[in-house]
């Protein structure tokens, strides 16, 4: 804002500039907002954790609406694979910290908003000192451990949490830890051993964009205490979205705060001191143990260059691609037959050498273990780094996705 610009004082002593009157005028015409609501937005501070597919639209609409301060927390950098859904970032920003890329975009969108960046991933050691500076927190991450960590921290600091997720064609949204409502751990007390991700299962850009936009909307409602989000009148609910179904939206009531919850129940087991000083013990007491796949023995793995030689010299080897059919249809190597991981149990008569490949060398290891149990007579092995390794080591023109 130009320091020479004339300041107009509102009736309650807070200030809006001429630019802000012009900028926010269309939403100030709404009876639900008006000048008091706009001033409430200007007084507010919001932390967005994750500057990706959810965070990008959420930040855009919150900054455009005129919140006072925005915090952006993300330790990742912009990658080309992000750009179809993370619409704040651009081709020229590849390799730049997402938080910096977002700040540049948002400062140009609305220079009246104070924007702070945190170029780090959320952890038990840094999250408390950051969240306590803000009024509302948005969880825009796609990591299960981080979701529990953010929720637990918000509970201990008394901050409301607007959480959303999106995968494939579906999304969900919920406000946690508000007016004695449930926290994330109340709803999902036990972490799921295997969690799908956008990188593995896919995501349609407008789906995650819709959910991020809804996070911004629910945050505005929360700040203004309107439309069912009034203090002491809040009835917890979850919004469910499916892009290709009719109706697309479902609004469901959710259970209240749980007495048995380790984070917010009367006998809670968590404290700030414990979480900050004992991160390993925190993951244990909260039943979160990251699932780490045990690597196959080196004798059961070959490089992409070794695979090239096998394709050229060993036509009698059985070549299996254990990706899903839709991925197999995107790109494939010659000689490989598509048998998805879910169907490898049907292969019980294999013999000789069997080479297994997948997208990046993880699913193929699981497939090899299953096939070894079913076919102890066969010599079964996989390709390190899968098709990504093939593109890196053998054929740079092979498409990655």
Swiss-Prot record:
Main location (coarse class): cytoplasm
Enzyme Commission code(s) on record: 2.7.7.-, 2.8.1.-
Keywords: ATP-binding, Cytoplasm, Metal-binding, Multifunctional enzyme, Nucleotide-binding, Nucleotidyltransferase, Transferase, tRNA processing, Ubl conjugation pathway, Zinc
Ranges of residues in domain Rhodanese: 313-399
Record-listed Zn(2+) binding positions: 183, 186, 261, 264
GO terms for biological process, alphabetical: cellular response to oxidative stress; protein urmylation; tRNA wobble position uridine thiolation
Cofactors that this protein relies on: Zn(2+)
Record PROSITE patterns: RHODANESE_3 (PS50206)
Keyword tRNA processing: yes
Gene Ontology molecular-function annotations: AMPylase activity; ATP binding; ATP hydrolysis activity; metal ion binding; nucleotidyltransferase activity; thiosulfate-cyanide sulfurtransferase activity; URM1 activating enzyme activity
CDD domains reported in the protein's UniProt record: RHOD_ThiF, ThiF_MoeB_HesA_family
Free-text cofactor note: Binds 1 zinc ion per subunit.
Listed GO CC annotations: cytoplasm; cytosol; nucleus
One Pfam family linked to the record: ThiF
Binding positions (ATP): 53, 74, 81-85, 98, 142-143
Location of this chain's protein in the cell: Cytoplasm, Cytosol
Pathway stated in the Swiss-Prot or TrEMBL entry: tRNA modification; 5-methoxycarbonylmethyl-2-thiouridine-tRNA biosynthesis
Family assignment from sequence similarity: In the N-terminal section; belongs to the HesA/MoeB/ThiF family. UBA4 subfamily.
Function of the protein: Plays a central role in 2-thiolation of mcm(5)S(2)U at tRNA wobble positions of cytosolic tRNA(Lys), tRNA(Glu) and tRNA(Gln). Acts by mediating the C-terminal thiocarboxylation of sulfur carrier URM1. Its N-terminus first activates URM1 as acyl-adenylate (-COAMP), then the persulfide sulfur on the catalytic cysteine is transferred to URM1 to form thiocarboxylation (-COSH) of its C-terminus. The reaction probably involves hydrogen sulfide that is generated from the persulfide intermediate and that acts as a nucleophile towards URM1. Subsequently, a transient disulfide bond is formed.
Protein name as catalogued: Adenylyltransferase and sulfurtransferase uba4
Organism: Schizosaccharomyces pombe (strain 972 / ATCC 24843)
